[in-house]
Amino acid sequence: MLKSKSKIFLYIFTLAIFSIVGNTIFNPFAHSFSSDETSLFLSFVDEIKVQEKLIKKFLSENDYDKAQKHLSRISQLYSDEIRDELSERNERIANEITDTISVIDDKIIQKTAKDEITNSIDNLDAILEESVSVRLEAAALTNSTVHALHFAQLVNSLDSNYKHSFTIPNFLRSNETSKAMHDSANSQHKESLKINEPTVSNNKTISDFISYETAKGLISVIKVIYNSTVKQDVTETDSLELDKMDDALNRLGLVVDSKLPYTEIAKLIHGIIHPKIS
């Protein structure tokens, strides 16, 4: 089994509860810095970087409206709580992030030349990198517990964004998640889930494309974090479990790319990923 397995499961289970309880208000950082400040800050930076890439993508397609909406996600992620916490370490950087977001906003509204907007986004990215070095101790970046929490927070964000892609009513989300978890538990003797089987959800149409594009962007980040950190703590005897985790993460990408119903993500996250690291 994975090292620190009980810790990883506890952290991911806790974040999953946060996701269920917090469905009524979409705020990925409603619990910012409440449990492990280091891992949450790393997740915050990763999520902003996802939005930066999406802004560039839509600018290249001349879709300033979607670029603006993804910038709004950055503003949402950079909450007052995170800003205040960062200000305690370095007020200049905290202010520069705020100012740069505002500059990008103005340029998108005015439909400034794409290269100029891209340069401002690159500037924001550089400031974020500096914020990591200022905010975190070097030892934290090699801490296995931090890695596990970092991975867990990003999985939680993927879960949340994919839910909101379909805007399923809260009571249906709860029922469908429970049903998906029950179905997964009953099929654990099978080595994998058939993600194309009929699902309890009739809502198969994406209605929130900003959340959907965010979920897509998070998939690649989650895989990178898993392969570069969490996976490195696994012993040779855990190779079979690694294969199952690799398969589950690949299936996450297939579900999102295929725009399958949210219950399919629930099956993978709550039915495979959580149990495999418990």
Report each predicted region and the residues it spans.
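Sec-dependent N-terminal signal peptides of Gram-positive bacterial secreted proteins and lipoproteins
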Residues: 6-29
